[in-house]
Amino acid sequence: ETSFVSANSCENGVSYRTYVGGVCGFNGEGGHSFTDITSNIDVKGSTCDVGGLFGIAHYGNNFVNCSSSGDVEIYAADDIDSAEEIGGIAGVWHNENGTTVTFTNCSFTGTLKTNITEGVDLSNNTITGKAYSSTGTGNLIIK
């Protein structure tokens, strides 16, 4: 049986960003390296930013030899955009200030599931979900 982590970010009918992952929900920006991380943890989050290892992968960080095999689920997304903020390694990647988020030799063998299915495409979310940005600058590199 697999271990699990679950986070609910809804209170009094208001939804907030969930930021939950099997290892870390929110990692800070700039120059951190996460190397040789393996997890078999099921992760459930209520609204968005739900990943097998990290809820959000911030700009300037590098992820090397990371793998996740647990199931990842968003169970109360408010809309299609929130439902697509799910990923096998990171729920979203934050591109800001023209910097790069890099994933090298990372893999996911679990399943992705969200409460909204119509109009939601998770086929490219095995490493990370969609970009979350206020400026639209920055890059995602997956090797």
Task: Put a short name on every predicted segment.
Residues 1-143:
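Surface-exposed loop/turn motifs in large extracellular/passenger domains
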